[in-house]
């Protein structure tokens, strides 16, 4: 019985083995046809992608696609013309639909319809040439810094920027916003050096030094309930998002600034009521807190971006700046006057010393004349 079962299995497997052997023979003959260049040329049919890519075709003479004799010439021509294969029935090339190009060229196995080249990528752009995709999520990187490294290929939305204040060096600083409103120039063109080159000179609590910037400030102190005049009382544009259904941003409500900018998830009401300061304000609108530490930024540059809400002390005193364009300090003026007085005194002494030899001969000659007259 064992021999009968073996013979039956061999009889059953023989057609499969013969078919497999015939397929291998056909494959070998196809390779030979590929070497000889005897693949069928079917003009009017799409090119065989596998043949164009490898130079071989497993279907041989039964392949229904075209097999050009010089496939390298076909590849070069397609690159020059920018043509891509149309393979009806195959999935469409997503990269081709988005950009209108395909790095695989004629060897791509997907369909490239000519009337849909770059149709998905034809979207409107904002003022910075980034794509506007209303149905997609906002690009967090673009909202945070105002740029996007992916450019036109980014799949997220890039909303229009409502203000150029996002590009300032110190975001949310009322000083830079005030400078923009006064000069009419973009605030980001003001560097720290150019602003501090000729700062206001604070002299005495009873008044403020007159100068080119004197019109921006008022003299005297301000009570806690009064609104200070100066840089910090000037209006500025609100560039933070308003989200009515969300909680209010506590940092924004307290200081008027928000480090997260347009990506903050909290509400930033435009009509924010500034709480009255809990201390006396100086003539430039900065808080005087004698028991608190000195504001480092104010001590260096004479300004403070937090304004009346700063928790440090901003005393009124004379600032000395190491800048040629800055106003000279009283100590330097006194030193210059002392030097001038010393030079004048030395000049007078030297002139008197030089005058003595000229006067002595005259006196001597007069005495000699008197003596001669007596004799």
UniProtKB/Swiss-Prot annotation:
Alphabetical UniProt keywords: DNA-binding, Metal-binding, Nucleus, Repeat, Zinc, Zinc-finger
Span of zinc fingers (C3H1-type): 42-70, 87-115, 133-161, 243-271, 289-317
Single GO term (MF): zinc ion binding
Domain of life: Eukaryota
GO cellular component, one term: nucleus
Intracellular or extracellular location(s): Nucleus
Pfam families recorded: zf-CCCH
Residue ranges, annotated region (Disordered): 352-375
Protein name: Zinc finger CCCH domain-containing protein 57
Chief localisation class: nucleus
């Amino acid at each position: 019985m064992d021999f009968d079962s073996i013979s039956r299995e061999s009889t059953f497997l023989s057609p499969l083995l013969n078919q497999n052997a015939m397929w291998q023979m056909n494959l070998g003959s196809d390779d030979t046809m590929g070497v000889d260049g005897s693949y069928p040329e079917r003009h009017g049919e799409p090119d065989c992608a596998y043949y164009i890519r490898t130079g071989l075709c497993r279907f041989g003479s039964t392949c229904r696609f075209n097999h050009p004799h010089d496939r390298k010439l076909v590849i070069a021509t397609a690159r020059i013309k920018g043509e891509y294969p149309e393979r009806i029935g195959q999935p469409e090339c997503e990269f081709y639909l988005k950009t209108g190009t395909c790095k695989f060229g004629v060897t791509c196995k997907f369909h490239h319809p000519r009337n849909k080249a770059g149709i998905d990528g034809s979207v409107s752009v904002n003022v910075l040439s980034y794509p506007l995709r209303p149905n997609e999520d906002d690009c967090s990187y673009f909202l945070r810094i105002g740029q996007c490294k992916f450019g036109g290929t980014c799949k997220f939305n890039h909303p229009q920027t409502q203000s150029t204040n996002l590009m300032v060096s110190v975001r949310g600083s009322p000083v830079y916003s005030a400078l923009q409103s006064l000069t009419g120039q973009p605030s980001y063109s003001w560097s720290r050096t150019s602003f501090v080159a000729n700062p206001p000179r604070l002299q005495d609590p009873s008044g403020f030094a007159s100068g080119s910037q004197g019109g921006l400030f008022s003299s005297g102190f301000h009570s806690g309930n009064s609104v200070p005049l100066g840089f910090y009382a000037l209006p500025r544009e609100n560039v933070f998002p308003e989200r009515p259904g969300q909680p209010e941003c506590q940092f924004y409500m307290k200081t008027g600034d928000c480090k997260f900018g347009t990506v903050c998830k909290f509400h930033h009401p435009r009509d924010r009521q500034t709480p009255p300061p809990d201390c006396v304000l100086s003539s430039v609108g900065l808080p005087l807190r004698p028991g608190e530490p000195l504001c480092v930024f104010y001590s260096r540059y004479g300004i403070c971006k937090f304004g009346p809400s700063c928790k440090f002390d901003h005393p009124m005193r004379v600032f000395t700046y190491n800048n040629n364009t800055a106003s000279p300090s009283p100590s330097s003026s006194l030193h210059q006057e002392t030097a001038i007085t010393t030079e004048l005194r030395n000049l007078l002494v030297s002139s008197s010393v030089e005058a003595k030899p000229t006067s002595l001969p005259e006196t001597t000659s007069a005495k000699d004349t008197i003596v001669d007259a007596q004799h």
